[in-house]
């Protein structure tokens, strides 16, 4: 299965002050953001979100972004993912409640926009079975995984049977400069894919 995802942009707006201004009475959007980030992670850790639910703050910008100034606004994104769309939407309701609660308690203005949304995609069990058999013929016992990243297959999944074949990244690292896969695993993945495609082309089509 490929996870559904929702991407939101949030802006907390407060009041800009000099860094030497008294702490009392500030309307500091950076402090609001920090509180939200902590509470969102705690919500997941304490079971308020499913264990396989992910929420990520991927972009963050302060304005005016000056070291001696309390920012006037903080803009950030929240990306959420889960394979089950109703679970995804319920999780977002809980996170959105936190977003609004922090803004209200700190006297911050709030802008919230959903930037994108995609539904979860169920991969083809038949294609997966072809992959499994091809891997086992190469002496590998494959693992069945859910995919958090969307992949191009998500765009095709509603029209044709799709499957995903993964080769392991060293230490599980992905989407970072340290991402790497051992050459022998790359070769094995290519062989398994070749075997699977030959099987599908030869009559194993789901």
Name what the model sees in each region.
Residues 1-86:
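Midchain, well-structured core segments that form catalytic/ion-binding scaffolds
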Residues 7-10, 30-41, 96, 132, ...:
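Predominant activation on well-ordered alpha-helical scaffold segments within soluble catalytic domains
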Residues 42-57, 67, 102-113, 141-146, ...:
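Flexible, glycine/charged-enriched surface loops at secondary-structure junctions
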Residues 91-99:
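Short amphipathic alpha-helices in soluble, non-transmembrane regions
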Residues 120-138, 163:
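Short, low-order "capping/linker" segments at domain edges
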Residues 142-192:
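Zn-dependent metallopeptidase/amidohydrolase metal-coordination segment
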């Amino acid at each position: 299965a490929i996870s559904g995802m929702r991407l939101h942009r949030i802006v907390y707006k407060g009041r800009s002050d000099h860094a030497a201004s008294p702490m009392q009475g500030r309307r500091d959007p950076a402090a609001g953001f920090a509180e939200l980030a902590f509470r969102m992670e705690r919500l997941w850790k304490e079971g308020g979100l499913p264990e396989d639910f992910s929420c990520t703050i991927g972009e963050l910008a302060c304005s005016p972004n000056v070291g001696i100034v309390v920012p006037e606004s903080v803009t950030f994104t929240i990306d959420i993912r889960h394979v089950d769309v109703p679970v995804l939407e319920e999780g977002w309701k809980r996170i959105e409640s936190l977003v609004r609660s922090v803004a209200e308690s700190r006297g911050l203005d709030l802008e919230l926009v959903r930037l994108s949304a995609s539904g979860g995609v169920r991969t083809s069990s038949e294609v997966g079975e072809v992959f499994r058999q091809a891997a086992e013929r190469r002496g590998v016992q494959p693992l069945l995984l859910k995919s958090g990243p969307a992949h191009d297959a998500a765009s095709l999944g509603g029209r044709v049977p799709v499957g995903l074949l993964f080769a392991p990244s060293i230490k599980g690292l992905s989407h970072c400069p340290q991402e790497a896969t051992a050459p022998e695993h790359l070769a094995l993945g290519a062989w398994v894919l070749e075997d699977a495609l030959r099987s599908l082309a030869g009559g194993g089509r789901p």
